[in-house]
């Protein structure tokens, strides 16, 4: 496994592979890797000839400096996981490498997909995501890029970003990996106590209840949201950020629960903010 810390080394290796006719797959991460990331690596390896993983905690996407400071780091463990999963190259830049002149004063937006969910509750977050992704794509020049659908809005934004700017990259969304009890795997879970982990299971329980209500024939989104919210309100440890039912393609509000549907929740368990979602396909009557 090759480990690179500067973009020129990555570009040189990628160009060599491409000259050999190899297709490049890319999984950008912020490190503290877990089995959810490992699944992305496996999906990448199954489709691409060479797999590149980046590990970089991007300061531009944190609207809370304290959240950035507390983001967990385990570089040694991350490299071991990448090697065990047969990743070909790990790009391990520092902040000065990605932003040599500081974080630039440029704003990247896709307004139609940034009217709700995390774009509202974390202002500036996705602008920072699009900024770093544009730079990483420039450095790695992948044919495929893989993103987990736990961060569903991010996946949609990056896919639309590539389409709008005609990046020759196929953006592939991968299903959320969960614990045996249903908790979506996240690097932030490491900051939860055992009691908080138990309480956090209510997020998935709420989503599944919403799914069941919709498939039982309920068409009113407000009614389903109230039923879902009751589950979360049963815990004094959960502070709801948002609970939304939207069109899964456009993120527009729904008046009738038909077609492609996204159920999305963000909530604080103690000091830790967790997100999760389900997507459903309901026949249009």
UniProtKB/Swiss-Prot annotation:
<feature type="binding site">
    <location>
        <begin position="185"/>
        <end position="188"/>
    </location>
    <ligand>
        <name>ATP</name>
    </ligand>
</feature>
<feature type="binding site">
    <location>
        <begin position="148"/>
        <end position="151"/>
    </location>
    <ligand>
        <name>ATP</name>
    </ligand>
</feature>
<feature type="binding site">
    <location>
        <begin position="30"/>
        <end position="37"/>
    </location>
    <ligand>
        <name>ATP</name>
    </ligand>
</feature>
<keyword id="KW-0963">Cytoplasm</keyword>
<dbReference type="GO" id="GO:0005829">
    <property type="term" value="C:cytosol"/>
</dbReference>
<comment type="similarity">
    <text>Belongs to the pantothenate synthetase family.</text>
</comment>
<keyword id="KW-0547">Nucleotide-binding</keyword>
<dbReference type="InterPro" id="IPR014729">
    <property type="entry name" value="Rossmann-like_a/b/a_fold"/>
</dbReference>
<dbReference type="InterPro" id="IPR004821">
    <property type="entry name" value="Cyt_trans-like"/>
</dbReference>
<dbReference type="GO" id="GO:0004592">
    <property type="term" value="F:pantoate-beta-alanine ligase activity"/>
</dbReference>
<keyword id="KW-0566">Pantothenate biosynthesis</keyword>
<feature type="binding site">
    <location>
        <position position="177"/>
    </location>
    <ligand>
        <name>ATP</name>
    </ligand>
</feature>
<dbReference type="InterPro" id="IPR003721">
    <property type="entry name" value="Pantoate_ligase"/>
</dbReference>
<keyword id="KW-0436">Ligase</keyword>
<feature type="binding site">
    <location>
        <position position="61"/>
    </location>
    <ligand>
        <name>(R)-pantoate</name>
    </ligand>
</feature>
<feature type="binding site">
    <location>
        <position position="154"/>
    </location>
    <ligand>
        <name>(R)-pantoate</name>
    </ligand>
</feature>
<feature type="active site" description="Proton donor">
    <location>
        <position position="37"/>
    </location>
</feature>
<dbReference type="InterPro" id="IPR042176">
    <property type="entry name" value="Pantoate_ligase_C"/>
</dbReference>
<protein>
    <recommendedName>
        <fullName>Pantothenate synthetase</fullName>
        <ecNumber>6.3.2.1</ecNumber>
    </recommendedName>
</protein>
<dbReference type="GO" id="GO:0015940">
    <property type="term" value="P:pantothenate biosynthetic process"/>
</dbReference>
<dbReference type="Pfam" id="PF02569">
    <property type="entry name" value="Pantoate_ligase"/>
</dbReference>
<comment type="function">
    <text>Catalyzes the condensation of pantoate with beta-alanine in an ATP-dependent reaction via a pantoyl-adenylate intermediate.</text>
</comment>
<feature type="binding site">
    <location>
        <position position="61"/>
    </location>
    <ligand>
        <name>beta-alanine</name>
    </ligand>
</feature>
<dbReference type="GO" id="GO:0005524">
    <property type="term" value="F:ATP binding"/>
</dbReference>
<keyword id="KW-0067">ATP-binding</keyword>
<comment type="pathway">
    <text>Cofactor biosynthesis; (R)-pantothenate biosynthesis; (R)-pantothenate from (R)-pantoate and beta-alanine: step 1/1.</text>
</comment>
<comment type="subunit">
    <text>Homodimer.</text>
</comment>
């Amino acid at each position: 496994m090759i480990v690179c810390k500067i973009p020129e080394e990555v570009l040189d290796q990628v160009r060599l592979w491409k000259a050999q006719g190899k297709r490049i797959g890319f999984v950008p991460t912020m490190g503290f890797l877990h089995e959810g990331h490992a699944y992305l690596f496996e999906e990448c390896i199954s489709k691409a000839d060479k797999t590149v993983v980046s590990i970089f905690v991007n300061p531009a996407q944190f609207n809370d400096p304290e959240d950035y400071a507390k983001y967990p780091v385990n570089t040694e463990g991350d490299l071991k996981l990448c090697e065990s999963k047969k990743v070909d190259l790990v790009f391990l830049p520092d902040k000065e490498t990605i932003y040599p002149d500081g974080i630039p004063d440029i704003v990247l937006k896709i307004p139609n997909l940034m009217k709700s969910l995390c774009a509202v509750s974390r202002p500036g977050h996705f602008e920072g995501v699009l900024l770093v992704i544009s730079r990483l794509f420039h450095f790695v020049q992948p044919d495929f890029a893989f993103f987990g659908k736990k961060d569903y809005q991010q996946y949609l934004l990056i896919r639309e970003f590539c389409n709008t700017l005609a990046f020759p990259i196929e953006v592939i969304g991968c299903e959320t990996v969960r614990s045996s009890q249903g908790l979506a795997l996240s690097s932030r879970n490491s900051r939860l106590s055992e009691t908080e982990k138990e309480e956090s299971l209510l997020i998935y329980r709420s989503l599944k209840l919403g799914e069941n209500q919709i498939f039982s024939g309920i068409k009113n989104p407000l009614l389903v949201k109230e039923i879902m919210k009751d589950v979360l309100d049963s815990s004094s440890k959960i502070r709801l950020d948002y609970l939304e039912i939207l069109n899964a393609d456009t993120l527009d509000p729904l008046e009738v629960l038909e077609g492609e549907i996204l159920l999305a929740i963000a909530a604080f368990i103690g000091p830790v903010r967790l997100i999760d979602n389900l997507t459903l396909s309901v026949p249009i009557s």
